[in-house]
């Protein structure tokens, strides 16, 4: 007879009964007394489902029968006390411990799972993100460690008190941040420590690693307040001059941006124009170095 904590017990009564064996022939016809020997062997049943403070009581009845079918009985009681089994995180088929994401110009998202087991059936297992670290190219990164850590989330409840296995689901969401500062060949590695804790306070930890790889972002010329891309000049039989600025942005922080005048297209009244295209091209000059490798914005002076 099994009593105590039986929820989670894998063996049926027949299997439990077979775990106790006793001497078949105790007395022969020349003896009045002898010893009956019994032995308990659980075989492949480890009773790991028992948690701390839980126990299983197996009560066996041993019957001695003589040649005249007279009997006597004695109970043998086996008490199995539970101990704490630690939760264990594993990477099973379909699970993943991270992902590599390429910068796309928009928010970055990915998700995955890890498998968790705690053999103590009545224990509850919860998951939290307990630590974070980063490495790689971070010049130009405009998010602090707390904001980067908040980009990964996990489900809190992994295993309830009625199961031994559960799934830890993790989700990475950059919350609109594009990591556009990363240029081609650059990358940022984010490492999240995920810890599962059972009812007894024992833990297991696994890292989830997100690698973000950069891409080349083209520089963009714009006309901001105070800039100008045209000028009207009245000819006055002397050298003519004008100047202005254009704004430039390249979100790849480590890129350098230079400016050159590449073409000219005369239009309007060109009949009688003595200057050829190379001469006209040389009339407009710009600063060569627009953005250094530590900034995202710069100015073209023409």
PLM regions and their residue ranges:
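Short loop/beta submotifs within extracellular cysteine-rich repeat domains
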Residues: 46-49, 70-72, 85-88, 98, ...
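Interdomain boundary/hinge segments at the C-termini of tandem beta-sandwich modules
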Residues: 78-84, 116, 210-216, 248
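Exported/extracytosolic protein signature
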Residues: 66, 79, 86-89, 104, ...
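Acidic, turn/loop-rich segments in luminal/extracellular domains of secretory-pathway
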Residues: 11-80, 138-212, 236-237, 270-302
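Extracellular ectodomain surface segments
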Residues: 1-18, 88-149, 220-280
């Amino acid at each position: 007879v099994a009593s105590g904590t039986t929820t989670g017990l894998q063996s049926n009564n027949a299997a439990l009964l077979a775990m106790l064996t006793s001497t078949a022939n105790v007395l022969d016809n020349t003896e009045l007394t002898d010893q009956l020997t019994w032995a308990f062997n659980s075989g492949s049943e480890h009773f790991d489902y028992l948690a701390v403070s839980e126990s299983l009581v197996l009560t066996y009845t041993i019957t001695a029968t003589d040649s005249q079918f007279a009997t006597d009985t004695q109970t043998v009681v086996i008490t199995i006390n539970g101990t704490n089994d630690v939760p264990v995180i594993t990477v099973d088929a379909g699970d993943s411990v991270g992902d590599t994401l390429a910068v796309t110009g928009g928010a970055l998202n990915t998700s995955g799972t890890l498998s968790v087991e705690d053999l103590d059936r009545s224990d509850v297992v919860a998951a939290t993100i307990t630590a974070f670290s980063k490495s790689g190219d971070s010049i130009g990164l405009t998010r602090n460690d707390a904001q980067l850590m908040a980009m990964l989330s996990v489900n809190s409840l992994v295993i309830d008190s009625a199961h031994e296995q559960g799934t830890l689901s993790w989700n990475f969401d950059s919350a609109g941040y594009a990591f556009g500062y990363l240029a081609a060949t650059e990358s940022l590695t984010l490492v999240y420590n995920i810890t599962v804790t059972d009812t007894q306070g024992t833990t297991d930890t696994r890292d989830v690693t997100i690698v973000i790889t950069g891409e080349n972002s083209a520089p963009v010329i714009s006309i901001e307040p105070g800039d100008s891309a045209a000028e009207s000049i009245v000819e006055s039989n002397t050298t003519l001059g004008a100047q202005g600025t254009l704004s430039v942005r390249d979100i790849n922080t480590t890129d350098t941006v230079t400016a050159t005048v590449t073409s000219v297209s005369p239009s309007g009244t060109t009949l009688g124009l003595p200057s050829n295209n190379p001469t006209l091209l040389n009339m407009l000059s710009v600063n060569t170095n627009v953005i250094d490798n530590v900034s995202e914005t710069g100015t073209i002076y023409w």
